[in-house]
Curated annotation (Swiss-Prot):
Compositionally biased residues, Low complexity: 24-33
Residues at which Zn(2+) 2 binds: D201, E236, H333
GO BP term, pick one: proteolysis
Protein's recorded name: Vacuolar membrane protease
Glycosylation sites: N148, N657, N736, N763, N803, N875, N921
Names of required cofactors: Zn(2+)
Basic and acidic residues bias (residue ranges): 587-605
Keywords: Glycoprotein, Hydrolase, Membrane, Metal-binding, Metalloprotease, Protease, Transmembrane, Transmembrane helix, Vacuole, Zinc
Subcellular location, principal: membrane
Sequence intervals crossing the membrane: 58-78, 402-422, 433-453, 477-497, 503-523, 536-556, 636-656, 669-689, 697-717
Length: 960
């Protein structure tokens, strides 16, 4: 009994000793493993690198935030005039100071053609030119008031309109050393519209030209080639000053031109257009180039309805550039285009770039000779852009060749790689996965574009006029949020595998861009390649996605087989590059902490993982050079794409967003542009959309909600972004009734007009009649008659007399001479309403009138000005310099076959544009009190522009 107990106790002790020994061994092994893990623990730099560039939600979200911040900042720096440096050289400082003073004098008052202010500006420029060229014997000037300053031409073909114009351009010629070299024209216009002080349009251009003239006169050194400066008049209503220059003897001296213009109010002067690549490439020689051929494409496609003198010079066979201010358009042609709204930096940007361009070309002895060596290349339209004062340009044919190469090479390379990886089962993509991304995008676009955008439009129709970027940010956030939700849903229901998403999206995006590039390339191959000259961004976007696709497919193709990349149950799916899941976690915990936790909890699984097939290990080692490929693909595709899309979208929106006030068609275009820009901004992020962390999702929700609230409460018009209304006071010659007409989009003018004192006091009803394209004409009878001619009755503002006639038999050619007297009016129009009039004469007398059959077709001059067109002339516009002289007109006309009487009936319409006060018997009157009233009593969110070439129009019906 005792022995048995002793043996049992000994066994227990031995077992306890064994357990203690085993525990000690396990403890030693644990310590060894812990020490081994500590030795294998990556360095701090490695851990930071893995934390930042590992495919984690937080890393990706930080990348997205950094990308947006960087792109917006770079775009602001690139487009803002604030980053233009003032000159530091004393001579340039003096040039700027003198030019700024000149601009202040020019912009002292409104100065439309035919006004006293216009005459004052003309006289100032004449004196200033004479001052600047004193002592420079190689510089001469000409006042275009000579025997040949008057002419007639066809100004419109539909309907047929003939214009008569008297020019008083101021011209300067800087004689070049080499008369064989083609000369350069520098042009701007010194007139304004009646409602504007003309600072940006086009005082900046005029002041810049004076600065350049100042520079050359101080140099006392002749340039190699001749430079002609055209300070022209009456650009605003027909580009007439530029047209007049084409008839001046100095026109034959020049072949190239630089036109200075302004369609905004300040900012930076952008290269709008270039006639060809051969001249555009010389813009790289300016110090702060700012350019985009997007605007050139807009002009070529008729999206920009206003024109500049560039059009006249190009049609006259010249080659050159159009340099202009383009924003903000709110102040364009309004009283806000004044000195207060611009800056010396804006002036210096135009002046310095113009000076650099002209100075370089004037010294270049080869310029003009090289242009003829490769005419087919150099005369093609140019594609151009700038970034941070670097200028890039290429011809459309060169871009066409590059695009053809891109369209061919990448599809072959990526297509072969894609075919290889799929057929060898290295990368398996199901049909549902392949269509899931396009389906998700289409569903997202439908939800956002047709529900969100349309609801915004119904709540705040004109908000894009003042807040285009608010709408872009809101729509983009909602798009990205909805798309991400749809992707998560697809992944949840196993429609698409997460490991397929990124590369699959990149491949499909590259295909979408390929289709767009094919369309662009087809357009570049035609004769109208300028209509696609702003689509160069598509080439870049396709290249970025194609390169990323190539790298991703290479990563898959280097693996032996897709099955070797399967991992143990319970592990995360590896990246496309095969890197272990611990460096590609979807959660936001520290990688190394989680790694240690896994070793303690799943040691067996870790050992199992390390002993996986040699093929898998070899595949990992093979593609290890592609580690963290998500970050490489992101950096290739996203930042540059986002910047190009955002910056291009910003430029276009800033240029056209105000046009939705001008027509329903323009409104549709602006809204389409808004969602196109928003969708385009989302496209580069599609491959990574499912990896945004919860904080990024909250930010998107916040932007979407806040933006939607702002859309509902923010006013579309304010002081900085006013509603632009157009004014015209009409006088009916039948009853001499005066009425004010205001033109605007439907529903915008009535509330403003109802608050005018004259309307409230008279209880006049405002009548609005619908016009084409969403516009309306709101009018009311005004008690504030114009006082342009104090002491005159309204019925005497126009006098039309028939000074003689030479009637022939019925259906023969009739001849009538009439005299039109409209004091202080320098512009009248005759509206015939049909094609009865076959020839018009300005300045003729009945006695010297030649027979109709002896008149040559078109324009001719023989003491008088003749224009003949047997197909019929519908309108005749007349412009004269002397406001007190009359228009002497002769008409050759045929009665209609159904006319019962041999009578010609037409309307004479004369315009007055001068707002200068007038006096009678020591009493001062406002010339146009009705216009002063609308300016004074309108809300601060309203600005006023002219509707026609004058602010007052008097119409009288005439029978001869």
């Amino acid at each position: 009994m005792a022995d048995n107990n002793s043996s049992s106790g000994s066994l227990v002790i031995d077992e306890q000793d064994y357990d203690v020994h085993e525990a000690g061994q396990q403890g030693q092994q644990g310590q060894q493993k812990h020490q081994q893990r500590q030795q294998e623990r990556p360095s701090l730099i490695t851990r930071v690198f893995r934390s930042v560039f590992g495919y984690r939600k937080t890393s990706l979200s930080l990348f997205v935030v950094a990308t947006i911040a960087l792109c917006v900042s770079l775009s602001y720096i690139d487009n803002s005039v604030d980053f233009i440096s003032f000159p530091t050289v004393e001579s340039e400082v003096n040039l700027l100071n003198a030019a700024w003073l000149d601009l202040q004098v020019i912009a002292k008052e409104q100065h439309p053609y035919g006004s006293i202010g216009n005459d004052r500006v003309h006289d100032f420029l004449e004196r200033r030119i004479q001052e600047l060229i004193t002592g420079a014997n190689f510089i001469t000037w000409d006042n275009d008031i000579n025997g040949n300053n008057s002419f007639m031409f066809e100004s419109s073909s539909n309907p047929k309109t003939v214009s008569y114009y008297e020019s008083n351009n101021l011209l300067v010629k800087i004689e070049g050393k080499n008369a064989k070299l083609p000369g350069i024209l520098l042009s701007s216009h010194f007139d304004s519209v009646p409602t504007s002080y003309g600072v940006t349009d086009d005082g900046m251009g005029v002041a810049s030209m004076l600065g350049i003239l100042n520079y050359f006169s101080q140099q006392k050194k002749q340039p190699e080639r001749t430079i002609v400066m055209n300070f022209n008049n009456n650009e605003e209503f027909g580009l007439l000053g530029a047209t007049a220059f084409t008839r001046h003897p100095w026109f034959k001296l020049v072949k190239y031109f630089l036109n200075l213009e302004g369609t905004g109010a300040g900012g930076k002067a952008i290269l709008f257009r270039a006639t060809d690549y051969g001249i555009a490439k010389y813009f790289q020689n300016v110090r702060t180039p700012y350019a985009s051929s997007i605007f050139q494409q807009g002009f070529a496609n008729g999206l920009v309805h206003s024109e500049t003198d560039y059009k006249v010079y190009k049609e006259a066979g010249m080659r050159g550039l159009d340099l202009a201010f383009f924003k903000p358009r709110d102040y364009y042609h309004t009283a806000e285009d004044n000195i207060r709204r611009t800056s010396e930096k804006s002036l210096w940007h135009m002046l310095s770039n113009s000076l650099d361009f002209i100075d370089y070309l004037s010294k270049d002895k080869e310029f003009g000779m090289n242009l003829e060596e490769k005419p087919n290349l150099l005369e093609e339209p140019a594609v151009f852009a700038s970034f941070l004062n670097y200028f890039f340009t290429i011809s459309t044919s060169q871009l066409f060749k590059i695009n053809v190469a891109l369209l061919t090479v990448f599809p072959i390379l990526n297509g072969l790689l894609l075919l290889y990886t799929i057929r060898s089962r290295k990368w398996q993509v199901s049909f549902s996965s392949a269509i899931s991304i396009p389906v998700a995008l289409l569903v997202t676009m439908f939800i956002v574009v047709y529900l969100v955008v349309e609801s915004y439009k119904s709540f705040n129709q004109y908000l894009p006029s003042s807040r285009p970027l608010l709408l872009v940010a809101t729509i983009t956030s909602i798009l990205l949020l909805v798309f991400s939700i749809i992707l998560v849903a697809f992944s949840f229901f196993s429609i698409i595998a997460e490991e397929n998403l990124r590369l699959l999206a990149i491949v499909e995006l590259s295909f979408a861009y390929w289709v767009g590039l094919a369309f662009t390339t087809h357009g570049l191959s035609g004769a109208e390649s300028a209509r696609h000259s702003g689509e160069f961004a598509v080439s870049i976007l396709f290249t970025l996605e194609a390169v990323a696709s190539f790298l991703g497919l290479i990563g898959w193709s280097l693996c032996r087989n897709r099955s070797h990349l399967q991992v143990a149950e319970g592990e995360s799916v590896p990246l496309l590059n095969g890197i272990d899941a611990r460096y590609s976690s979807d959660n936001d915990h520290d990688h190394e902490h989680r790694h240690g936790h896994e070793d303690n909890e799943h040691g067996e699984a870790h050992v199992q993982q390390q002993s996986q097939s040699r093929h898998k290990k070899q595949c990992k080692e093979t593609v290890h050079s592609f580690g963290y490929d998500w970050s490489l693909q992101y950096l290739i595709t996203v930042p540059l794409s986002i910047f190009i899309i955002y910056n291009s979208g910003w430029l276009v929106l800033e240029g056209v967003n105000k046009t939705l006030q001008e027509s329903a068609k323009a409104e549709t275009f602006v809204y389409n542009l808004l969602w196109i820009v928003s969708v385009s901004l989302v496209l580069p992020l599609i491959p990574f959309a499912g990896k945004l962390n919860r904080y990024m999702v909250f930010v998107l929700i916040a932007i979407g909600v806040l933006g939607t609230l702002l859309v509902h409460v923010v006013q579309p018009f304010n002081e900085a972004n006013p509603l632009k209304l157009r004014f015209l006071q009409r006088i009916d010659g039948k009853n001499n009734a005066s009425s004010v007409h205001v033109y605007a989009r439907k529903g915008l003018a009535t509330e403003v007009l109802e608050q005018l004192p004259s309307v409230r006091q008279s209880n006049e009803t405002i009548h609005c009649s619908q016009l084409a394209d969403g516009m309306e004409d709101c009018s009311f009878v005004s008690a504030l008659a114009p006082q342009i001619l104090p002491g005159y009755e309204l019925g005497n503002y126009i006098e039309v007399t028939n000074n003689g006639s030479a009637p022939s038999q019925l259906f023969g050619v009739n001849y009538n001479q009439i005299k039109i007297v409209a004091l202080k009016s320098q512009s009248c129009s005759l509206h015939f309403g049909d094609s009865k009039v076959k020839a018009v004469v300005v300045g003729s007398s009945l006695e010297s009138a030649p027979a109709f059959k002896h008149l040559p077709s078109g324009y001719s001059f023989n003491k008088d000005h003749f224009y003949k067109d047997t197909s019929g002339i519908w309108n005749l516009t007349l412009n004269k310099l002397d406001s007190h002289s009359s228009f002497d007109i002769s008409l050759y006309w045929l009665p209609g076959i159904d006319d019962e009487a041999n009578t010609l009936q037409f309307d004479v319409e004369c315009f007055w544009a001068d707002l200068s006060p007038v006096a009678l018997n020591n009493t001062v009157f406002e010339a146009i009190p009705a216009f002063n009233e609308v300016q004074q009593y309108s809300p601060i969110s309203v600005s006023w522009a002219n509707r026609e070439k004058g602010l007052v129009a008097y119409t009288k019906q005439v029978h001869v």
